Amino acid sequence: MEELQRYLKMDRSRERDFLYPLIFQEYIYVLAHDFGLTKSIPYESMQILSYDNKYSSLIVKRLIIRMYQQKHFLILDNDSNQKKFLGHNKNLYSQMISEGFAVIVEIPFALRLVSSYQGKEIKKSINLRSIHSTFPFLEDKFVHLNHVLDILIPYPIHLELLVQNLRCWIQDASFLHLLRFFLYEYHNWNSLTTQKTKQNSLFLKENRRFFLFLYNFHVYESESIFLFLRKKSYHLRSTSSIAFLDRRRFYGKIEHFKVVFHNDFHTILWLFKDPFMHYFRYQGKSIMSSKGTLLLMKKWKYYLVNLWECHFDFWSQPNRIHINQLSNRFLDFLGYLSGVRPNPSVVRNQMLENAFIIDIAINKLDTIVPIIPLIGSLAKAKFCNLSGQPVSKPAWTDSPDSDIMDRFGRICRNVSHYYSGSSKKKTLYRIKYIFRLSCARTLARKHKSTVRSFLKRLGSEFLEEFLIEEEEVLSFILPKISSSSQRLSKERIWYFDIIRINDLMDLS
């Protein structure tokens, strides 16, 4: 953020009105390359999009000169007959403009966030809500709830709605026209909002920062209604959050909301007065849970569908919102199947000469690894078949033995690390068995031997590659409880870094 303020020395009262000229400034592309997703050093030699090019100041200057010409944005046209421009592939210039544009479009939000916290101090890190708050919620609050609304974030009916929403933050008409150009040029919004696993290479390599910003802004707009309802119905101080991209440190929360729809909601807010309504979200999926009745959740579902379609022009089909009763059905979230099951216990109460036997059922959080989708993913990656029988990896037989064992062991440890929050560890043992035997069959295939003789020759050292050092980690973090590490290995353990393993969250 300090870099951005150092480069952009302009009056803050005019920042949002003059964004378009920044597209012609060289330092914008230096910034984009500096703190972009690659995290590389500016002007350092690198390969972009698998082309043999160098990101240098000379290429940036050529790009700016080209944009000053009459038809400067024709370089973004993906014409297969003209693959080279000034000796470089045009996809390189397309990526550079997209990255620079993503930096510029973040400026109004970033500077407003900084200015809102000038002279203020954030006293407690707990106020910086994040995805990490999901795990305490599951442990402390989830077991006391009855129903859950499983919601897929709605998406705009038309791309023009994104531009209209940004007009409230950016008044530069030329910049908004350029935004329309990018939206219609790449046609990536549908693949992003529908959360498809197979996204095109253009989004993955060129426009990731730009379209993630648009998606975050879209989610921020769709979630603003919850802030409004919270303020109007409970009169409590509430804040909304907006996440900027590829930041490794927490930012504060933006205390900004446009008060709208006052007359529309005044007569129906009494329907939703539930002090135990909880909401959390990750990626394109959100959860609303409550201790209320099924009728209340049906009202919320009907209300949200009509609200998003009528007031926000979001396409939200009713089948994108499912009502689940936690006692009867598991919830698919963060790659886990989470549910609530009663844990019966018997208590003997002695009162003078009388004794009473009391049956108590305490709800307990049950997190299960989705074994069938997980085995399907492993079968797709050629570690096993659809029945869960391990198979060899012929494509890896050309690598040294140490590399093969390291690759298998690293994948196995990542999966075990991610699903350490499972309440049933037997599924993890089966996954470890698949990786262990698949590695053994791969090595046996390479050395033209049988699996039995190969395992006999390697001995117990082969198994150590696939055993996660969970006890060692716990003894390092909590040295006083190393004696009970065997008991802790059977308990549910949440690691905050599992949110970086995105592939395991989309197994369905």
From Swiss-Prot:
Keyword tRNA processing set for record: yes
InterPro entries assigned to the protein according to its UniProt record, in alphabetical order: Domain_X, Maturase_MatK, Maturase_MatK_N
Domain of life: Eukaryota
Any one GO cellular component localisation term in the record: chloroplast
Localization terms from the record: Plastid, Chloroplast
One Pfam family from the record: MatK_N
Molecular function GO terms recorded: RNA binding
Keyword entries, A-Z: Chloroplast, mRNA processing, Plastid, RNA-binding, tRNA processing
Transmembrane segments: none
Any GO BP: tRNA processing
Keyword RNA-binding: yes
Family membership noted in the UniProt record: Belongs to the intron maturase 2 family. MatK subfamily.
Chain's role: Usually encoded in the trnK tRNA gene intron. Probably assists in splicing its own and other chloroplast group II introns.
HAMAP family from the UniProt entry: MatK (MF_01390)
Protein name: Maturase K
Species whose genome carries this gene: Ranunculus lingua
